[in-house]
């Protein structure tokens, strides 16, 4: 699925080869700096390539959640259930959330550009990470959260289903957003 947005009509627009004509140079979707796609020996043997969308420097700005985290909300560096989850549990609310990355300045900027500035191609950045994390939910039916007609018109896309589409993750649209009073 391709979509016209402020960036490229095609995801490979602007890609070129390095001086030797070998490795593919890409433009980072976040900073526009050119970078060489890394090559993995397994990729060469299996003839499968892993698409890279951002440079190493930008990727390093996103902080992965460590193995030490709240078991309910994935708040980083919490060895047991965090105080927020305890609070909500006491109120009768079940907290069960999984996160791959911390919400830091890089993630904040990413969401600003992706959701609010309509840069649909940024949905590619985390699609493979999400696909990998979703493998343990193979038997589940994934449902998307609907957005209002106005938001879809404004953005031009549903941000959740777009990431799922880029990750080739199957899902269903069973819900519809009703206009609120």
Regions found by a protein language model. Give the residues of each.
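Glycine-rich phosphate/pyrophosphate-handling loop used in enzymes and phosphotransfer proteins
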Residues: 1-181
